[in-house]
From Swiss-Prot:
This is Atlastin-2. Residues 1-458, 503-565 are cytoplasmic. Monomeric and homodimeric. The homodimer, transiently formed by two molecules on opposing membranes, is the active form mediating ER membrane fusion. Interacts with REEP5 and RTN3; these proteins are involved in endoplasmic reticulum tubular network organization. Interacts with ZFYVE27; both proteins are involved in endoplasmic reticulum tubular network organization. Its EC number is 3.6.5.-. One of its GO terms (biological process) is endoplasmic reticulum tubular network membrane organization. Residues 356-447 are annotated as: 3HB (three-helix bundle) domain.
Amino acid sequence: MVLKKGVKFFQRLINSKSLRFGENYEDDDLVNSDEVMKKPCPVQIVLAHEDDHNFELDEEALEQILLQEHIRDLNIVVVSVAGAFRKGKSFLLDFMLRYMYNKDSQSWIGGNNEPLTGFTWRGGCERETTGIQVWNEVFVIDRPNGTKVAVLLMDTQGAFDSQSTIKDCATVFALSTMTSSVQVYNLSQNIQEDDLQHLQLFTEYGRLAMEEIYQKPFQTLMFLIRDWSYPYEHSYGLEGGKQFLEKRLQVKKNQHEELQNVRKHIHNCFSNLGCFLLPHPGLKVATNPSFDGRLKDIDEDFKRELRNLVPLLLAPENLVEKEISGSKVTCRDLVEYFKAYIKIYQGEELPHPKSMLQATAEANNLAAVAGARDTYCKSMEQVCGGDKPYIAPSDLERKHLDLKEVAIKQFRSVKKMGGDEFCRRYQDQLEAEIEETYANFIKHNDGKNIFYAARTPATLFAVMFAMYIISGLTGFIGLNSIAVLCNLVMGLALTFLCTWAYVKYSGEFREIGTMIDQIAETLWEQVLKPLGDNLMEENIRQSVTNSIKAGLTDQVSHHARLKTD
């Protein structure tokens, strides 16, 4: 435990080179944990363990930030930036910090020769941020409606680097989306189809972890397209981004079902969708290894659009307060939500996402189907298995319906990817398989009924007896051709009976035995049973008629006696 706390402290220290905003501290400066929390700096609250690819919440650091007396009961606004690694997320957040510290100034963006400090960032091709970091100074802002809110800025580990699995990327993105009120999805140059598919996977992983699923579980998603190179098609900024996003997320009838599902999923996950097109910052930024964020090295187009973007997210009138399940979230509440969510991702309840949501969802649902079907089969074996006696068909059907409902409830209780519509197909598959299994249990149970087992020989014997009687009668009155035909049928029935007995005794020629059973079943259902039912119905009708006649006769006799008297 002491070692873990030490590791956490040094990770916070390493990620906090700029302890005071605007000042740079040397790496070898010794700063205790209390000083770190007093000075503005990035603090890692979700630690990424590369050895086992697990994540750990630094509860102490999070509580020190969010449970300060002056902010803990304020509603919170969480602005997070997520996306692929080495795409300038931390760089953007540092300009957000400049705005938060100087929002009342027209020149909040800073001076031309002022280095960019705050969240640690650098040029190059290797990742910088791991896990999830937040700025340890929570900004208290007065809203136009007179209320105060707390604003927290969040930086996330870049996705798809060489050291992170798909599960790592999904966990970080899902956690940041679940806990933020505005998620900035940082992309380079364009919105490609794989960007949308990854977004679908990551948001589904977040939706799955939430206990109650509402129609739109997340709040605002802002697509930020960096290095936009087509201003002649869609202009820089919010309006051009809106037009571009509408085209990208449009659901068309001639689209493949997979493409339609991705777009429907994104629309169903977020209450608000936006897009901002940002130009390239310039060659000096991209190619100069010593670039430190000075505005003089950044192109004017980029600076102009940056002045529009940051207030769009952080101006008091534009702030989006965090809500979960329709209720506002305070700083104190957010601590508890972080604790609850991280436990879910540390456990084994959730399926591990793969490269495509569809594959994971199919495997997940098929496993749920198999488990529910197995539960049904084992329970039915206890009712009418091989060592159980014959059970009345009505009782068997009642047990079947009860156990089927149990199996469906089990299927529904399993956490599944894909959404209700996708899972419904697998529930239908489960119900169909259960009905097929039930049909086999019916046959198995009927085989234990001595009368059912004797149905084939009884039917054949009845045919032989009927043919014998008819043959005798027709021969007596001179209809020899009919008598010969009846004798032929009687001989055929006797042959079937002997063959059936041999098959049952020896176990050979089972196909022939099955065919004889089917013939006997058809004769029973189509001829003998209806004939017997008609005879019984006629007998019952005759009995009722006789009873009515007898009753009427008694009444007439009774009235006649009364008149005589």
